[in-house]
Curated annotation (Swiss-Prot):
It comes from the Bacteria. The lineage of its organism: Bacteria, Pseudomonadati, Pseudomonadota, Betaproteobacteria, Burkholderiales. The keyword Cell wall biogenesis/degradation does not apply. May be involved in the transport of PQQ or its precursor to the periplasm. Transmembrane segments: none annotated. It comes from Cupriavidus necator (strain ATCC 17699 / DSM 428 / KCTC 22496 / NCIMB 10442 / H16 / Stanier 337) (Ralstonia eutropha). Belongs to the PqqB family. Keywords: PQQ biosynthesis, Transport. GO terms for biological process: pyrroloquinoline quinone biosynthetic process. This is Coenzyme PQQ synthesis protein B. Pathway: Cofactor biosynthesis; pyrroloquinoline quinone biosynthesis.
């Protein structure tokens, strides 16, 4: 049986964010709000054996692995369950964890689109840096709907679904989008036939993305911001949620309305920004999600597929 383990459920910076004193961050530090700290988003896919696919390598990966003993099978003096890494994009909070995995015993298999590999080869040259350590064995993911598998987890079929979003701020293509800058991931269990759709960064939901969401048994999607002006209103940033490539949860056409139209048995939000009021467990916003049957991911959450 395929299982999705949420290693990290927060957006970039984690929760609480190191330099933030918003209501949520200050409250969780002081213990004055009902909220649980979270690390930066990443998941692990496992099957019946000990091996796992790491999807996105968070800067918090070492802490996340310590909190997931099953990902250290201890079959040898140096060991890990991580058989390969799949990247959804080249964002800082999704790739810098690769540096923490540099002691891997051999070249680490890395699956990413050509656009992401291009950014990691030049603008943020992780592939060149890691060539002096374990090295990376890169595999370019197709963006045409062709399914692929990652050995030794051959019971899983994965498909990269191009999304309309933005390349990282450091990328020379930030304002010249390419297919594959950001993907969603269709995850299918060959034995059960069940599927999940994972997309921690969703800026716009067009017809083909909605079709993916609608066909999935489980959706694990972008819950970054509650409001489009969430960063602007308190003066944290001049950018809206849409400017940063995220569809806000509330409001007309927001993620709540999208999820309301889906038949999925579980609808789960991930990549939650530290400012998002849904992090407070007794907030009106969290209650609204519950009324719509929407869950909020947390570190250590296990999702059976």
């Amino acid at each position: 049986m395929t299982s999705i383990r949420v290693l990290g459920s927060a957006a970039g910076g984690g929760f609480p964010q190191w330099n933030c004193n918003c209501h949520n961050c200050d409250g969780v530090r002081r213990g004055t709000v009902r909220a649980t700290p979270r690390t930066q988003s990443s998941i692990a896919l496992t099957g019946d054996g000990p091996d796992a696919i790491l999807v996105n390598a968070s800067p918090d990966i070492l802490q996340q692995l310590r909190q997931a003993p099953a990902l250290q099978p201890a079959r040898a003096p140096r060991d890990t369950a991580i058989a390969a890494v799949v990247l959804m994009d080249a964002q800082i909070d999704h790739v810098t964890g690769l540096l923490m995995l540099r002691e891997h015993r051999e070249a680490l298999p890395l699956y990413a689109t050509a656009a992401v590999l291009d950014d990691l080869g030049a603008a943020f040259p992780l592939t060149r840096i890691l060539s002096h350590y374990c090295g990376l064995r890169t595999h370019a993911l197709p963006c045409d709907g062709t399914a692929f598998s990652v050995p030794p987890l051959d019971g899983l079929t994965l498909t990269a679904i191009p999304l309309e979003s933005k390349a990282p701020p450091y990328s020379p293509n930030r304002h010249a989008p390419r297919a594959g800058d950001n993907i969603g991931l269709r995850i299918e269990d060959r034995r059960s036939g069940r599927s999940a759709f994972y997309a921690p960064g969703l800026g716009r939901i067009d017809d083909h993305v909605f079709a993916e969401l609608h066909s999935a048994d489980i959706v694990l999607v972008d819950g970054t911001f509650w409001r489009d002006d969430e960063m602007q209103a308190p003066g944290f940033s001049g950018k809206s949620a849409a400017d940063m490539g995220h569809l806000a949860l509330s409001g007309p056409g927001g993620m709540i309305e999208v999820l309301e139209r889906l038949p999925a048995s579980r609808k789960i939000l991930i990549h939650i920004n530290n400012t998002n009021p849904v992090l407070v467990e007794d907030s009106p916003e969290r209650a609204e999600l519950a009324r719509h049957g929407i869950e909020v991911a947390y570190d250590g959450m296990e999702i059976a597929l």
